[in-house]
Swiss-Prot record:
Superkingdom, taxonomy of origin: Bacteria
Matching Pfam families: CLP_protease
GN (gene name): clpP
Entry keyword Membrane: no
Catalytic activity: Hydrolysis of proteins to small peptides in the presence of ATP and magnesium. alpha-casein is the usual test substrate. In the absence of ATP, only oligopeptides shorter than five residues are hydrolyzed (such as succinyl-Leu-Tyr-|-NHMec, and Leu-Tyr-Leu-|-Tyr-Trp, in which cleavage of the -Tyr-|-Leu- and -Tyr-|-Trp bonds also occurs)
InterPro entries xrefs: ClpP, ClpP/crotonase-like_dom_sf, ClpP/TepA, ClpP_His_AS, ClpP_Ser_AS
UniProt-listed Enzyme Commission number(s): 3.4.21.92
PROSITE patterns assigned to the protein according to its UniProt record, in alphabetical order: CLP_PROTEASE_HIS, CLP_PROTEASE_SER
Enzyme class: hydrolase
Protein name, entry field: ATP-dependent Clp protease proteolytic subunit
GO molecular function, one term: ATP-dependent peptidase activity
Length: 199
């Protein structure tokens, strides 16, 4: 069963105007990245980033993250857009940033990466497979691509933290969960937010 998206009513000299809550947040340069990372969600996030950057690239964009991760290509499209635009992208992790979510959240502008006290981070190696009935040659191609993807993601994580590539590789061998304090020590975030001190 779906959930109801709240509507916000605003009064102005020209009368009342109704917004869905996400459109209203977008007016304040806030983007909500929630749920699994997949192509449709990534396209929506990218469009919002581009729109806000075109509106005013001197102001921060606030990206709230709560995701179990998902598609590597969709996630990297978001990261590439974050790096492409001129606006600083401030990231706030609430709930969790797992797997591809960790790549996205840690790619916020350095010095502007935050996490709520009870949120969690997860790093691990990328997953994939060739499927049943796949020829051996195709399986080798898939395995080689997975290794390339793993190296690329681990390099991003090393660049976004204060850990070496070797340490990232070791820690990502299996699921590696971190609470907010551990994530701060690891270097993926710059501050744990106890209250809203952003505005």
């Amino acid at each position: 069963m779906g959930y109801l998206v709240p509507t916000v009513i605003e009064q102005s000299s020209r009368g009342e105007r109704a917004y869905d809550i996400y459109s209203r947040l977008l007016k304040d340069r806030i983007i909500m990245l929630t749920g699994p990372v997949e192509d449709g969600m990534a396209n929506s996030i990218i469009a919002q980033l581009l729109f806000l950057d075109a509106q005013d690239n001197t102001k921060d964009i606030y990206l709230y993250v709560n995701t179990p991760g998902g598609s590597v290509s969709a996630g990297l499209a978001i990261v590439d857009t974050m790096n492409f635009i001129k606006s600083d992208v401030l990231t706030i992790v609430m709930g969790m940033a797992a797997s591809m979510g960790t790549i996205i959240a840690s790619s916020g502008t350095k010095g502007k990466r935050f996490m709520l006290p009870n949120a969690e981070y997860l790093i691990h190696q990328p997953m994939g497979g060739a499927g049943q009935g796949t020829q051996q040659t195709d399986m080798a191609i898939v395995a080689e691509q997975l290794l390339k993807t793993r190296k690329r993601l681990e390099q991003i994580l090393a660049d976004n933290s204060n850990r070496s590539l070797e340490q990232i590789h070791k820690d990502a061998e299996r699921d590696h969960w971190m609470d907010a304090k551990e994530t701060l020590e690891y270097g993926f975030i710059d501050e744990i937010m106890e209250n809203n001190s952003l505005k």
